[in-house]
């Protein structure tokens, strides 16, 4: 038998946690500030915990409140999404994904048409980020990240590595006969300062001062290398189209591996059938990438 959930109290808490203010929550819910405060107090009594620290100019969530808020955010978001789809008469199961921008544009997007043909009843909601993501508070099913797979709250499945290499336009590449020739070029880098240092070490050369701009994401760095000159350090796998059409060249075969792309999802979130389908499809596509 299911436990009777105090839905009004949960809604009052969720709005209060989002605004960190009872008055703003009351305006959103079309009730009085006193009613919201009372609902939250009832919820605290039922759970046996304190959810907010009452401050002179607002509220501060306790650790217990943070846990409850992350669950409710996902739940209310899912309910609202499905409700709107029923209203429009176009219900489809949605899988929400956040991906590093370089991966999303350079690798995932060109493959999504095939997924949609195979699974027309599954709608993929894709957004990009700079490798910083909170699956719980953002209501995400999956996040595709770059790194070493050491995220404690998620299941982390390796997709493939994407070694960094020197990329530039064909004109910029003409005088580059040896890695030390880079001393005469403008070198771009991402927010990770150590990337070039590790590439220099792999090339058995002394470090060169990085004088170019700092870019986040890598795609902006590549655009600058193509249209303004300069040299980028980026994963060639993510820019295969630009290499194939001659916009980019790889003047040296030297590559440095600093991590992998990973498919991650919360340990606390049950896997839906549509999530299983997307996960299996993505892992199969990643295997194709590795075998090529």
Curated annotation (Swiss-Prot):
Alphabetical list of Gene3D superfamilies matching this protein: Periplasmic binding protein-like II, Winged helix-like DNA-binding domain superfamily/Winged helix DNA-binding domain
Family annotation (InterPro entries): BlaA_PBP2 (IPR037422), LysR_subst-bd (IPR005119), Tscrpt_reg_HTH_LysR (IPR000847), WH-like_DNA-bd_sf (IPR036388), WH_DNA-bd_sf (IPR036390)
CDD domains on file: PBP2_BlaA (cd08487)
Record PROSITE patterns: HTH_LYSR (PS50931)
Domain of life: Bacteria
Ranges of the DNA-binding region feature: 22-41
Domain annotation HTH lysR-type: ranges: 5-62
Gene Ontology terms, MF aspect: DNA-binding transcription factor activity; sequence-specific DNA binding
Keywords, ordered alphabetically: Activator, DNA-binding, Transcription, Transcription regulation
Effect after changing residue 124 to V: In strain: 5E78-1
Effect of residue 171 to G: In strain: 5E78-1
Record-level GO BP terms: DNA-templated transcription
SUPFAM superfamilies in the cross-refs: Periplasmic binding protein-like II, Winged helix' DNA-binding domain
Known role: Positive regulator of the expression of the gene (blaB) for beta-lactamase.
Family: Belongs to the LysR transcriptional regulatory family.
Protein's name according to its UniProt entry: HTH-type transcriptional regulator BlaA
Species of the source: Proteus vulgaris
Lineage summary: Bacteria, Pseudomonadati, Pseudomonadota, Gammaproteobacteria, Enterobacterales
Gene: blaA
